[in-house]
């Protein structure tokens, strides 16, 4: 699941980078070759419209790239998906940082399911929700996730997870504010 989640995030980030290059090329009167993968150096040369979340949102709205009626490949739509995934991760880590509930620690599968139901399930089809249920059953044990944050015990994990959660909360709150300000929270 961690590998799958990481791959989906990488794909969405790459899409935003490609959109940035296309936007930059159009701004300079050139056509962008969609088949070429952008390089880090190319990003430095691209238009400044994608230098921040706010500038990307404003540039895409101004250019008419975002459609509120049907799905389009836009940085705003992709950012919204990343934003929802960030909420899922934050909620899952909050659960992982908590102590025993009624004498027992929840499994990562239970924590992921709880977070999924809040953050992602409302935006997914029935079939995708059912597939997610299967994934939750296959998640590794808590120790695996603790090792991901370089700790061995729950006691060691809690303060580190709280720092990570605080950073995720800051990013989520700022992005939420920008998306809400431009009424982008329910893009198709």
Locations of the language-model features?
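Long, contiguous alpha-helical bundle segments
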Residues: 1-188
